[in-house]
Amino acid sequence: MSSLENNNSSWIDWFLGIKGNQFLCRVPTDYVQDTFNQMGLEYFSEILDVILKPVIDSSSGLLYGDEKKWYGMIHARYIRSERGLIAMHRKYLRGDFGSCPNISCYRQNTLPVGLSAVWGKSTVKIHCPRCKSNFHPKSDTQLDGAMFGPSFPDIFFSMLPNLTSPLDDPRT
């Protein structure tokens, strides 16, 4: 589905289907369209038209440029919302982000983290909540770390207190 020749999908469907983008969750259209969530983002009206179209228009000239950054920054905001945390929680429980390579962490599920909230500073890493270390993901992802930000793991565990703390794991 990563080919632009498949004109039966939206830009969001196409982008989420690209190999390496499995860390991302789908940001609902109503969240994307809410002007409050767009505050501070440049070129939002033009890019919004591209990413929300029901069919990819490869003649738009914007494809896979600014809209990737724009969607990524909206994604970083969304995953801090209640609905976004629920979506990321599902992915975390399924192990979609991988597991910690540290043998003493017993394949602890990890979360994506950015080393910076500034676009273009680093690619996404995985964060182990058990050993508190960041690692390069095993997947082929080249997602920008700003799509998650440096505080996402802390926010995730503070907003989902019903999760068992990794320190309470009986394997320790």
Curated annotation (Swiss-Prot):
Induction: In wild-type flies, it is strongly down-regulated by double-stranded RNA (dsRNA) interference mediated by Su(Ste) transcripts. In males lacking the Y chromosome, the absence of Su(Ste) locus, relieves such down-regulation, explaining why it is strongly expressed. GO terms for cellular component: cytoplasm; nucleus; protein kinase CK2 complex. Signal peptide: none annotated. GO terms for molecular function: protein kinase regulator activity. Transmembrane segments: none annotated. Pfam families: CK_II_beta. Probably not expressed in wild-type flies. In males lacking the Y chromosome, it is testis-specific and constitutes the main component of star-shaped crystals. Interacts in vitro with the casein kinase 2 alpha subunit (CkII-alpha). The relevance of such interaction is however unclear in vivo. There are multiple copies of the stellate gene in fruit fly, encoding proteins that are extremely similar, which makes their individual characterization difficult. Thus, most experiments probably do not discriminate between the different members. PANTHER family: CASEIN KINASE II SUBUNIT BETA. Unknown. In males lacking the Y chromosome, its strong overexpression leads to the appearance of proteinaceous star-shaped crystals in the primary spermatocytes causing meiotic drive, possibly by interfering with normal casein kinase 2 activity. Belongs to the casein kinase 2 subunit beta family. This is Stellate protein CG33238. It comes from Drosophila melanogaster. The gene is Ste:CG33238.
